[in-house]
Regions:
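Long, contiguous non-domain N-terminal segments
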Residues: 1-44, 48-49
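Charged, low-complexity intrinsically disordered regions
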Residues: 40-264
């Protein structure tokens, strides 16, 4: 894929979109543009940064992978795409964009129609999940959630039997709620170096980071509302330098986690 071919794809979209009325055909036109964008920008930058890469922009982390932890609710509607399986230096990882939607009962009004479905959709998570191999294998489960996390995320942890604990770090306890099946196992992970690194990482991502430890895996959710690796409006010419910088920025959480949390 060359930049000229990407621009051809964008121009083809603009030439045909006004003629196409069928929604499915319109979506297919945009899909072709998106595919070209990700082949040129995203795949190139992944190849330049990581090794052992398997990237599929249509696939994601399946809901079962998260729900089988017993700690993460995947809601009523679950979307995931931009699946990356790769290695950064010596660390294997998986990451994908994830959106989780929960249906909740709305309030009845005087105009309530009993035939209509009276529900409200709430996006409870929009961001990314990352899965890493973790060097410290544990036999229990540990969840570290941002203070103020909604009951949607705390309820599964409590139902799984994890108990709240605190560290000796006042600041860490102020920004995170820690739940563990076994306190001894939790403190095996939460040594002073890790606590300091996690505080730094959470600060970098505005305290919207949740960490889950299950055996030799670490799951990290960043609920920042971002949808990474998405193309710009096809109606406008593509600024190549701007888009390349944006893709590099979208990749940054992966390298940040590995570097800041000292997973190497």
């Amino acid at each position: 894929m060359t930049f000229e071919e990407l621009e051809d794809s964008r121009e083809l979209y603009n030439d045909k979109i006004t003629e196409v009325k069928n929604l499915r055909e319109r979506a297919e036109l945009y899909s072709q543009y998106k595919k070209a964008y990700k082949a040129y920008f995203v795949n190139y930058q992944l190849q330049a940064t990581f090794t052992d890469i398997k990237y599929n922009h249509k696939l994601g982390i399946d809901a079962f992978t998260l729900s089988c932890t017993g700690l993460i609710d995947t809601g009523d509607t679950y979307y995931s795409n931009d699946l990356i399986n790769a290695k950064y230096k010596t660390v294997n990882f998986t990451q994908a964009d994830v959106e989780i939607i929960k249906q909740s009962e709305g309030k009845f009004t005087e105009e309530y129609d009993p035939v209509a479905i009276n529900q409200r959709s709430d996006t409870v998570f929009k961001g990314r999940f990352l899965i890493f191999e973790f060097s410290k294998k544990i036999f229990g489960r540990v969840a570290i959630l941002p203070v103020g996390t909604s009951s949607f995320f705390t309820n599964p942890v409590v139902k799984a039997g994890l108990k709240p604990i605190e560290t000796e770090s006042t600041h860490f306890n102020r920004i995170f709620k820690i739940y563990a099946e076994d306190g001894f196992e939790a403190f095996y992970i939460l040594d002073p170096a890790f606590i300091e690194s996690a505080e730094h990482f959470a600060d970098r991502y505005c305290y919207k980071v949740a960490l889950y430890f299950i055996h030799d895996k670490m799951f990290i959710g960043i609920n920042d509302g971002d949808d990474s690796f998405e193309p710009p409006d096809p109606a406008l010419p593509i600024d190549e330098n701007k888009e390349r910088a944006k893709v590099i920025e979208d990749m940054k959480p992966i390298t940040d986690i590995i570097s800041v949390l000292d997973l190497l």
